[in-house]
């Protein structure tokens, strides 16, 4: 588990490698678009023009697109949920944890302390939509196209593929070596 600031700033360098190696973990990222623990500083996912105590004249930076990033890094399971829909969120967490391999669940979660205007429960509740019923979660390019619609975030399973995990690959190397370490 992590937040948008930690996950896509300080800790962002580890995510691509865990995804591409298909490490068997579930990464739940809570995105409130702000560093709530540092008194409302903008995060890598804060919107352009967002005002905070540390950016009183608007945030000039474009936000990253985490779904698109994880899809391009090779994550084998990518989904998005919203804290304002707890039943759907529970279903998505359960699916992510059941997936064998790297699963990433992006959770839109308002910061009720430092964002009383932009990303509130009321605003997000009107913006989010479900992925289209005919969306094919085995099609990475279709998932990327959906991820590009960050002005109307879609909830649901964007992408899923079954492939060997890092643990499987390492087991294969041990088997290939006859269980012997070189040296």
What kind of feature is each model-predicted range?
Residues 41-50, 86, 93-98, 102, ...:
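Short, surface-exposed, charged loop/turn segments at secondary-structure junctions
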Residues 83-84, 108-110:
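Histidine- and/or cysteine-centered catalytic micro-motif in compact active-site loops
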Residues 20-26, 30, 74-75, 99-102, ...:
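Short coil/turn connectors at secondary-structure junctions
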Residues 43-96:
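Conserved thiamine diphosphate
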Residues 110-183:
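Flexible, low-complexity linker and terminal segments
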Residues 10-14, 20, 37-42, 115-120, ...:
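Short acidic, glycine/serine/threonine-rich loops at helix termini
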Residues 1-36:
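Thiamine diphosphate
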